[in-house]
Amino acid sequence: MFLQKILIKLEIKSTVYKMQVIPINTINFLKELKLNNNRDWFNENKQKFQSIKVDVKNFAGEVKDELNLSDDIENLKIFRIYRDLRFSKDKTPYKTNIGMAFHRKKPEFRGGYYIEISAEDSFIAAGFWNPN
């Protein structure tokens, strides 16, 4: 099942934290979705998507646990794959990435962490979105 893995490592205070991995079948699904971004294809591949959701939830949960070793993460949000098409000129129904946000405990802490996984470009972000 895990033919190839993406491994995220965070180095904090000379301690290396190993994170859960994203299986290659998740990346392959996102590649296929980009080529076939329509409801018929998605419905035919709904079982694959359900399996990937479990993998992503496990990954996000382990990332949250690891972040809590050095921070105070209050909650985790995994964003929906369905796009909001109401005001968009681009009518493709699905996102071709998986995004997740890790919110720090409030009101003591502000800011947070964000991970986005896609077949082309994945990234990790930390800090504040639109701070006042």
Specify the residue positions occupied by each region the protein language model found.
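Extended cationic-aromatic binding surfaces that line active-site or macromolecule-binding grooves
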Residues: K53-K105
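Aromatic- and glycine-enriched beta-alpha-beta binding-site module
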Residues: R86-N132
